[in-house]
């Protein structure tokens, strides 16, 4: 899309078509953030966190699917969440960096999520970058908890595209961590 096409699309866009949907979505987001406080996150069970058991009322389902319109990470591998339930194998799968058992892995992942949320509140970029969660997952969580601070674009290639498009390429930003590219 060239700049003139973008300007034309922007000028002819009818915001009223999605305004009510957006309001409902942000009401749901407010409920999500109030439900999943750092303390509540630390108490999640495997079934309350992980997709794969068939239910839709899990933390990861809400992050990925309920708020898809606020930035999509759908289509990513389930491993983006650190741990997932494989119906084919009837077991949990997770990389060894998170722990030796599903419970240990979950505990580590939940602690990382809480650390990320706290680092996002403090705008502690170093802690956010150092956090072991998958980059796209970190981006989605930060944009849900702090939508006024962190952009809801999770692909590094898309971030680079929009930085170029809007002439925001000074200071070597294109070669920096995606976290730095997402900060508003």
Predicted regions: what they are:
Residues 1-135, 148-184:
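An N-terminal alpha-helical hairpin/helix-loop-helix interaction module that forms a charged
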Residues 138-144:
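Short hydrophobic alpha-helical segments that form membrane-spanning helices or hydrophobic packing faces
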């Amino acid at each position: 899309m060239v700049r003139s096409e973008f300007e034309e699309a922007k000028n002819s866009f009818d915001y009223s078509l999605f305004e009510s949907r957006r309001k409902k979505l942000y009401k749901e987001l407010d409920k999500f953030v109030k439900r999943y406080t750092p303390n509540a996150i630390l108490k999640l069970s495997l079934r309350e966190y992980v997709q794969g058991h068939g239910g839709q009322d899990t933390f990861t389902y809400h992050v990925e699917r309920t708020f898809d319109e606020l930035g999509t990470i759908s289509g990513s591998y389930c491993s983006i969440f650190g741990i997932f339930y494989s119906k084919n194998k009837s077991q949990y799968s997770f990389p060894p960096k998170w722990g030796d058992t599903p419970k240990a892995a979950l505990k580590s992942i939940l602690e990382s999520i809480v650390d990320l949320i706290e680092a996002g509140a403090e705008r502690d970029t170093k802690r956010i970058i150092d956090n072991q969660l998958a980059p796209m997952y970190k981006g989605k969580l930060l944009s849900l908890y702090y939508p006024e601070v962190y952009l809801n674009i999770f692909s590094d290639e898309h971030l680079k595209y929009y930085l170029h498009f809007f002439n925001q390429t000074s200071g070597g930003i294109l070669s920096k961590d995606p976290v730095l590219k997402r900060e508003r």
